[in-house]
Amino acid sequence: MLTKINKAIALVFVSLISFYQKWISPLFGPSCRFIPSCSAYGIEAVNKHGPWRGGWLTLKRLSKCHPLTPCGCDPVPEK
């Protein structure tokens, strides 16, 4: 039962990020300092680690995406 709930929550997270990528991000243009972009990172993190750890990794990544952090490659960690 918990696995089904986790899958449903992961689907909601990925759907929200995909909505952002399709409808909101184009209004602002590319602004992420990292490769992959923060939204692509979020989708990969949730798909790879599940909604809770993937969501946490995404929040940590978003907190680093500002002008005081150097640009670069920041892949999703392996399990």
From Swiss-Prot:
Keyword Oxidoreductase among UniProt keywords: no
Coiled coil ranges: none
InterPro entries: Membr_insert_effic_factor_YidD (IPR002696)
Recorded GO CC terms: plasma membrane
UniProt KW keywords: Cell inner membrane, Cell membrane, Membrane
Annotated disulfide bonds: none
Family statement drawn from the similarity comment of this UniProt entry: Belongs to the UPF0161 family.
Role: Could be involved in insertion of integral membrane proteins into the membrane.
Name used for this protein in its record: Putative membrane protein insertion efficiency factor
